[in-house]
Amino acid sequence: MASAVARLDKLKLINPPAWLPSNTMFEGWTGSVAYGASNDASDMDVVGFAMPPKDILFPHLAGEISGFGNQIQRFDQYQQHHVLDKSSGKEYDIVIYNIVKFFQLTMDNNPNMVDNLFLPRRCVLHSTEMYEHIRDNRKLFLHKGAYHKFRGYSLSQMSKINKGSNR
């Protein structure tokens, strides 16, 4: 499958930074689609990561000196919610992370980020050689702290279910 960000950008349904569609390294279906719990009314959750241009990733290359003068706007993530594609009848929620933030969250064993490394192939919308290398080595991200992170995440999700919350 092709990149959802590139397709929605081409349809002018989203307005990401100009460099984002061509620098996205990975996109995947998450949420109900990934867990096989979606239906025709489900929104389509797309999560991924991108490699910003080097002057955004390393602001000193653009002449920025931290704390002096005009500061370059940082890129941590691009997100847009409730994007309605009338041609497909689907609504999208999109979050594309800066590769640095993605790695930080993944190395912290954030359950939502680790999930992206273990998505079923059918849920990988767009991947590059870089993502495939990361995916091939995904178990290296896991450590003993994962137990506590996933346990806490599971308990919070059960609490939401018991309270009848959807989010």
Where are these regions (language model features)?
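Alpha-helix initiation/capping motif
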Residues: 1-2, 53-54, 110, 128
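Helical scaffold of the NTase/Pol beta-like nucleotidyltransferase catalytic core
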Residues: 1-31
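Short, flexible coil/linker elements and helix-boundary hinge sites characteristic
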Residues: 12, 43, 137-138
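General "foldedness" signal
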Residues: 16, 38-41, 58-60, 113-116, ...
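Residues in well-ordered beta-strands of folded domains
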Residues: 28, 47, 103
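Catalytic metal-binding acidic patch
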Residues: 35-71, 76-80
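Conserved NTP/Mg2+-binding pocket subregion across the NTase superfamily
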Residues: 70-167
